[in-house]
Amino acid sequence: MLSFLSSNLSNTRQSIAQVLNFALVLSTAFMLWKGLSVVTASSSPIVVVLSGSMEPAFQRGDLLFLWNRSPRAEVGEIVVYNVKGKDIPIVHRVVRTFPEVEGKKEKTVKEVTVSTPTPPNMLLTKGDNNLADDTELYARGQEFLHRKEDIVGSVRGYMPMVGYVTIMLSEHPWLKSVLLGIMGLMVILQRE
């Protein structure tokens, strides 16, 4: 009777240890992601290129590293932005910048002096592989992007083809289920 209790207690302890190890891995990954978000000032410091609109600069499946601490974006800079109402990051190049416009209906432009802080800039973007600019991609009635509101970050580095795994998982939902099942079995069957 005593041996039965000790074996059950041992199995229970081992199961709890496995669950805690799994929770530790998840929480560590979450903390690393949030820490990277704070350092880069970007809600999504790493993104995957989902289309071929930036070829030849970036291919579909490239993993991009973003930085969002610059107050302005310049012409030629590659930025990642989200369209209002949609949560799909778009990677395109800035082709034009505008000064902040006050009273658009009156067509007056705010005068910028040396003592005035740099106004937030507005951007027009375009994919390198696209024929037209992105005004058709922006939200209805939006003619440009606001640097602070719409930009997720500027591209500072990339790793080719590493993000293709993410694309495969989103295009083939059954593959995601298979991988999660295999990972779950590995956690359950792991013995220390």
Swiss-Prot record:
It is found in: Endoplasmic reticulum membrane. Residues 40-192 are lumenal. The gene is sec11. It is a single-pass type II membrane protein. GO terms for cellular component: signal peptidase complex. One of its GO terms (molecular function) is serine-type endopeptidase activity. Its EC number is 3.4.21.89. Catalytic component of the signal peptidase complex (SPC) which catalyzes the cleavage of N-terminal signal sequences from nascent proteins as they are translocated into the lumen of the endoplasmic reticulum. Specifically cleaves N-terminal signal peptides that contain a hydrophobic alpha-helix (h-region) shorter than 18-20 amino acids. The C-terminal short (CTS) helix is essential for catalytic activity. It may be accommodated as a transmembrane helix in the thinned membrane environment of the complex, similarly to the signal peptide in the complex substrates. It catalyses: Cleavage of hydrophobic, N-terminal signal or leader sequences from secreted and periplasmic proteins. It is an enzyme of class 3 (hydrolase). NCBIfam families: sigpep_I_arch. This is Signal peptidase complex catalytic subunit sec11. Its main location: endoplasmic reticulum. It comes from Emericella nidulans (strain FGSC A4 / ATCC 38163 / CBS 112.46 / NRRL 194 / M139) (Aspergillus nidulans). Belongs to the peptidase S26B family. Keywords: Endoplasmic reticulum, Hydrolase, Membrane, Protease, Signal-anchor, Transmembrane, Transmembrane helix. SUPFAM superfamilies: LexA/Signal peptidase. The chain crosses the membrane at residues 19-39. CDD domains: S26_SPase_I.
